[in-house]
């Protein structure tokens, strides 16, 4: 229904709204996007989204990723930056989340071996205060991929010193 709406055929979205799904978060999100003066780019995979982000990033700066897991996105993005910093426990989710138990998405403690990467292992609330207590290079791009709001807000708050109007 969403893709039809983006292509100009709103009949499917309107039918869903009429059938009692008007307050569904996905329907509301689609309606919000369609209400914009300019429809945003739609990406059907993360690589396409990353390519768009890279096109806007200052690639002479550092890259930061909060939530590395197996390192696939880090590996893709680091090729475009002189240095990269990754933060993760590598032990999975630090708490239960949407029915997933603590420890889901674990890489079993395995830290990826990626050229140009500096990984900081541990929970954000424990590692970020010390890491950002020292001067760090400004960010060209930051990938916040921590899954949890609590982890992401911690990362956002501590990463402030490396974020400016040029950071993607």
Language-model regions, residue ranges each:
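S-adenosylmethionine/decaboxylated-SAM
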Residues: 34-36, 51, 56-168
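Class I SAM-dependent methyltransferase Rossmann-like catalytic core
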Residues: 2-64
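Long, compositionally biased, helix-prone stretches
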Residues: 1-2, 126
């Amino acid at each position: 229904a969403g893709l039809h709406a983006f292509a100009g055929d709103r009949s499917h979205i309107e039918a869903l709204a009429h059938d009692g799904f008007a307050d569904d978060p996905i329907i509301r999100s689609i309606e919000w996007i369609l209400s914009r003066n300019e429809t945003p780019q739609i990406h059907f995979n993360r690589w396409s989204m990353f390519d768009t982000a890279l096109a806007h990033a200052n690639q002479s700066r550092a890259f930061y990723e909060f939530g590395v897991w197996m390192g696939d996105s880090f590996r893709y993005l680091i090729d475009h930056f002189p240095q990269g910093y990754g933060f993760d426990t590598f032990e999975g989710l630090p708490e239960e989340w949407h029915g997933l138990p603590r420890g889901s998405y674990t890489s079993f403690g395995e830290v990826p071996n990626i050229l140009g990467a500096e990984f900081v292992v541990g929970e954000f609330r424990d590692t970020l205060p010390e890491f950002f207590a020292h001067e760090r290079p400004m960010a060209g791009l930051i990938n916040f991929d921590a899954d949890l709001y609590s982890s992401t807000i911690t990362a956002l708050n501590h990463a402030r010193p490396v974020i400016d109007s040029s950071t993607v």
